[in-house]
Amino acid sequence: MIAKEDEELADMISGLVKKQFFYINIDPYANAFNEEANGAGHQTDHTKMNDWIWERKYEIDSLCYPIQLAYLLYKNTGKTDQFNPTFIEGIKKILGVFETEQDHEHSPYTFVRDTTRKEDTLINDGRGAKTTFTGMTWSGFRPSDDACRYGYLVPSNMFAVVVLGYVEEIFQTILDDKEIVQKAQILKKEIQEGIQNHGRTVNQKGQTIYAYEVDGMGNATVMDDSNVPNLIAAPYLGYCSEQEEDYLQTRRTLLSKENPYFYEGKYAKGIGSSHTPKEYVWPIALAMEGMTTPDKSEKERLLNLLVATDAGTHLMHEGFDVNNPENYTREWFSWANMMFCELVMDYFDIRVEK
């Protein structure tokens, strides 16, 4: 938003987009890179590493966020220099990976880490749990960097549907490439149909809700994780309305004990993660809860809760103990700090144009 008036900031964001697509072109399956080809990072992992790659846990959202940033920069400033040949090549690679991973059984991607922490590696010789075709695209890991239990991560597929719409618009109105437009349209349609036909389950009351993960063979997880994209964030991402009935039923379910990562204690209640201890809720999840409700008093309650549970640091943490906020992970967490600021803006009806 500030970039609308600040050309230097807009140029910086554009440079960031260009750097992200530079890395995507090195390997669209990697989730973290080195500043230079120095061989740092998890080089002992059993996957196709190179000196540029820090870690190669494949996560759908790693490919969605750069598209979102490129599009929102254009939408809010009119800037288009980020749509350069590197961007175009990166989009082709992203579309190729999304298509390949619709049929993961024939994918070249595998990942094994020598570790005692099961969330840091994929079962089945690095291929993950077995899946069958649904139209959705497979993900090895969640936004938390923890392994998926089932391969079709529904909120990340929701995010993919949204950004494929961005790709379609960019290549129709700014860049003229009918082949990319057609491929994006087909993928968007197939993934959306996959979510609607296979990405839902029922809660304990028998109500239809969105599952967090499915395998296409009848297995599904009823849960949500704090890291975004998650199911709570579906309206924030632009996938659906805050008032969609299936979303509301999903939301009510996930903000209850039916979600194994929902915790309630003396000082707070909210969603945590497999990535942090039990009874720890995440400020990111609390902020997202606030940004996906139309109730202004609820937004205010959550803002006050976040301020009251910062353990006197005046910063947001990764997670904190619902019974003792003095116990927390990460003294400061940039992502959570940003989400708190965005919730403040949201409360005052200041929002990025999407």
Predicted regions and their residues:
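Hydrophobic core segments within long, regular secondary-structure runs in both alpha-
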Residues: 7-24, 67, 71, 84-99, ...
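Catalytic cores of carbohydrate-active enzymes
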Residues: 27-32, 96-116, 152, 162-245, ...
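Carbohydrate-binding/catalytic loop surfaces
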Residues: 31-57, 107-149, 202-229, 263-287, ...
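Active-site-adjacent mobile loop/cap segments within catalytic or ligand-binding domains
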Residues: 155
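Non-catalytic carbohydrate-binding regions of carbohydrate-active enzymes
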Residues: 178-218, 241-339, 346-354
